[in-house]
Amino acid sequence: MLSEGYPLCEVSLSELEAVPAEAGTTKALVRGIAARFAALGHSPMAFDAYVTSTVLPGSGLSSSAAFEVLIGVILNHLGSCGLTAPEIAQVGQYAENVYFGKPCGLMDQTASAVGNIIGIDFADPAQPKIQPVAFDFASCGYSLC
């Protein structure tokens, strides 16, 4: 995978054990997501990708969650796995917690995976309740780009 402005990131999907030296890196996220897909009974397929983003890394704008969801969607699609958006979010959270080494929650991944304006109830983190929030920006004089 090549992300614009970053060096090439290559990860062998046949080697899915956590690599402590990769903690905090893109490789850790990719490997962790692939490992979680495998643990869920899927065979992660190799892929090549060129990635660009307007989300600044480390900006507090959920750049890692957006990246995790991207990788999850790629693997889900290529393998015809059938994971739902909340399940892809949970896969991303697992990768970030266990492989990347950051004890994050599930909100950013869920918001990124589901999209739109939503309400999320995490009373049961294994089965978050997600509700769309109807809002008409134009009727309030706003435009969302």
Please place each PLM-identified region on the residue numbering.
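Anion-binding (especially nucleotide phosphate/pyrophosphate-binding) glycine-rich loop
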Residues: 1-91
